[in-house]
Amino acid sequence: NAPQTILGRVYDSIGFDKVGDDILRHLVIARCCEPQSKLATSAYLKSYFDEDISHFQIYRYMDKLYNTRQELVQQISVEHTKKILGGKIEIMFYDVTTLYFEASPGPEADIRQAGFSKDGKSKEAQIVLGLLVSEDGYPLSYSIFNGSQYEGFTMIPVIDDFVRKFSLKDFVVVADAGLMSSKNIELLKSAQYKYVIGARIKNENVKIRDWV
């Protein structure tokens, strides 16, 4: 099977074979070839790769991946990214999105809560997803937050954790103006992080628009 062979080599060259879970390999390849629901992915793997993996197994593996493999997967991803970028991560872009569920918000302790939704689904249960990527868009880190969490409160903890974990120095943080509250700017400065605030040109004053 050509996709399995070609994408399998890419998967191994990145280093994900070190995770040691065949189901992860199958899910990654299926996601690249035909991104769809877990149920449809199960059928796709059976039809095209003759892999008998039920959607229940896929859901259980998602829990395993998050609970026991997340650190290893991140380590592999970051090392691969550093190799591509010449051994150093100099720019980090941070952004946030919301992912909603076709369900009512859960109990108070549940991470799935109603909140400001980027999909206009403010009454649905959702989670907040924070994503940190390098230049050229290589993923560095992701974090999941309670659906009612204000997105501005997510940025600094994610960056601090990543910097500590990978001993980063001399880098620039880039985020849009919605995340760059005065409090976050103050925290960036106190940590001596360089930063760039993204903004819409049309919202800037005439002097800045002319300069751009």
Give the predicted meaning of each segment.
Residues 118-119:
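Glycine- and acidic-residue-enriched helix-capping/strand-helix junction motifs
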Residues 68, 114, 125, 131-135, ...:
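Catalytic cores of nucleotide-enabled group-transfer and carboxylate-activating enzymes in metabolic
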Residues 8, 129-130, 160, 185:
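Short glycine-/small-residue-rich flexible loop motifs, especially phosphate/cofactor-binding loops
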Residues 151-212:
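An internal, acidic/charged active-site-proximal segment
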Residues 1-113, 123-124, 130-143, 148:
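Dynamic "connector" segments at or just before major functional cores
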